[in-house]
Amino acid sequence: MKQSLNLFLLLAFLSLSLLGCGRKTVTRVSTDSDIDLSGRWNDADSRRVAEALSASALNAAWRENFIRYNNRKPVVIVGLVTNKSHEHIEAETFIKDIEKEFVRTGMVRVVQNAVFREKIREERADQQEFASPETAKRWGAELGADFMMFGTINSIVDSEGRRQVTFYQVDLELANLETNELVWVDGKKIKKYIVN
């Protein structure tokens, strides 16, 4: 009896060991490839929406009007994009995608948001004390933003049994910081059909 129990335990241990030896495969893929494993918001959604809305914003009348009346490129700050969807979406990656598109095109000038602006100011304060006078950056020379972009990410989920439809809507707005006027409003929608 004891020998049978030992044999059983040995076989059980070996079986579990073999099951644990399954190989995990990792493959490097292009960062701009679309891979959708779960049906949730992902990097491809963020990239596509950022590209579409950036192009829409940059090609709208507000930019040309500003250049015509001010004889310079507008300065934009990308502010808060609030996630109101049903899932955790890191809005910061989306905000950075928008900023990258703005900087990449060179059609507008972009200034830092409040968090990073404070870090830059701390560094400038340190320079006043620790850097040589020739290289210390002066106070009062920051570029003031003319426009601020902000928006929301929303979602609607409809499901029955193993099927689910998830609808995402990203709405962005651009406001003139001096007049509070909305100069551009647009949105992008994504709909995903998921079968589990």
What are these regions (language model features)?
Residues 116-135, 159-177:
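A short, terminal or domain-edge coil/loop segment
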